[in-house]
Amino acid sequence: TGLVEKKGIIYIWTNKNLKSRNLEIKVRKELGIEQKLLNQKEVLDLEPNLKPVFDAGVIYESAMHARDPHGILKKIFKLFLERGGKFIQANIKNLEQINKNETAIRSENDEYKFEKTVVASGAFSKSLTDQLGENIPLDTERGYHVHFKDCDHLLSRPVIFSNRGFGIPPMEQGLRVVGTVEFGGLDNPPS
């Protein structure tokens, strides 16, 4: 199976939430996003393993989804190395923009200087970019999900239950049920 699939994405809802869905559909149409409204039967024809607890849906046929985000990162990393990138595993303490073309990166033991630097430290990126004078409005987003192994065959594409606030994308690791995130900062315990 590929790392990324273009099978579309389906949003489903109940009739009691139709008003907000109509606005969403209208805005996306105005933005030129291709979409196809589906009744319950049409959704079930595409995804027969869904329980019919919804009334209608919309499919975005040109949408793509990642079946293996970790695999994607590994391929990008491999390509980075093949194109001459360096990987240095170190605990970074400080970044400093020395001049327009040079950044110093200091670890506990060494200092490295580079023409181009990418800060990709997840939740810890802001504390590093702040040292460069970049005021990036970045906070930590914690996402919560559950995987059901060996169930990815039950859906052929992601399905989002709009008014219930969760989605189910099929992934290499199984079906992932996602929906809850919090902007809790680095110091707060998980909720």
Would you name each region that the model predicts?
Residues 3-4, 94-97, 101-102, 111-112, ...:
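Active-site substrate-recognition segment that forms the wall
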Residues 35, 42, 69, 162-163, ...:
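C-terminal catalytic lobe of FAD-dependent flavoproteins
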Residues 45-49, 164-167:
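Short beta-strand/turn micro-motifs at beta-sheet edges
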Residues 1-5, 31-36, 82-86, 114, ...:
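Surface-exposed helix-capping loop/turn segments at secondary-structure junctions
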Residues 14, 69, 121-122:
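Helix N-cap/beta->alpha junction signal
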Residues 1-40:
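Dinucleotide-binding Rossmann-like beta1-alpha1 core, especially the glycine-rich loop
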Residues 19-29, 53-116:
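Helical element adjacent to the flavin cofactor pocket in flavoenzyme catalytic cores
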Residues 24, 49-50, 131-132:
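Residue-level signal for well-ordered alpha-helical positions
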